[in-house]
């Protein structure tokens, strides 16, 4: 049974950084349970507000329903008791419902509803998709607004009015006008989190739009740096944010943008660079080249991001 009510979960998640852990794979690309458990234990040893298993960074789109359930179950079992674990619902409505119910059975506290893969649908279709998932579980549900799943402000308002367990809106578009309409309609009824790739890049300006948190992919391999960056954002220390952007984040983006699909691959490359290998990515994604990993390793060293450590009292 979930420890958090949907609203309590929303209140908890909005006040801290969010982890989206990579799913570890063996050489044959089967899930490496031992390596994944070790990664979850390490991630949840830091003061993050929540951990989203089998999300985008976790290659949820490449997991079977059974693998999704198992990965979420392992995350629940391995995570620190202080860190709530959320599952991810992907694919068709039927698949998403199976993922959501599997997450609840595994002991997760909530569910992130990802866009249905390569399926174009209108506003009513998206409403029905999200509504079906909300009806299938008692867990708090967060929708991910991105790519082929652009939820209109009216749809988000309808969902928030009808389903008490609909708790959050994750944005992966950066459309300020769209976000302003949603936050105006829904106000504090929902919590809002940034979901653009390498969300740190946009975190400070989006804070002004009510997005008090975001999904941090780089937390996977440089958690101390990621938490320090988040603290600077919440303190609205623009000078510190700009310095970290200049020193590490923007050069990191240059490596990420060398090939399509590197948004996930660079996270696993980062883990390899810091000595925490989680294996490769599943096709059709491809791994970073050896030169890309070498360049990333150099950047981690020269920027200090790879060796940055939070004060002990902050990590406690």
From Swiss-Prot:
Q: Give the protein family.
A: Belongs to the DapA family.
The reactions it catalyses are:
5-dehydro-4-deoxy-D-glucarate + H(+) = 2,5-dioxopentanoate + CO2 + H2O
- Top-rank taxon of the source lineage equals Bacteria
Q: What class of enzyme is it?
A: lyase
Q: Which CDD domains match?
A: KDGDH
Question: What keywords were assigned to this record?
Answer: Lyase
The name this protein carries in UniProt is Probable 5-dehydro-4-deoxyglucarate dehydratase
Q: Which InterPro entries match?
A: Aldolase_TIM, DapA-like, Dehydro-deoxyglucarate_dehyd
User: What EC number(s) has UniProt assigned to this enzyme?
Assistant: 4.2.1.41
Molecular function (GO) terms for this protein are: 4-hydroxy-tetrahydrodipicolinate synthase activity; 5-dehydro-4-deoxyglucarate dehydratase activity
The organism encoding this protein is Corynebacterium glutamicum (strain ATCC 13032 / DSM 20300 / JCM 1318 / BCRC 11384 / CCUG 27702 / LMG 3730 / NBRC 12168 / NCIMB 10025 / NRRL B-2784 / 534)
Its GO biological process annotations read: D-glucarate catabolic process
| Pathway(s) the chain acts in | Carbohydrate acid metabolism; D-glucarate degradation; 2,5-dioxopentanoate from D-glucarate: step 2/2
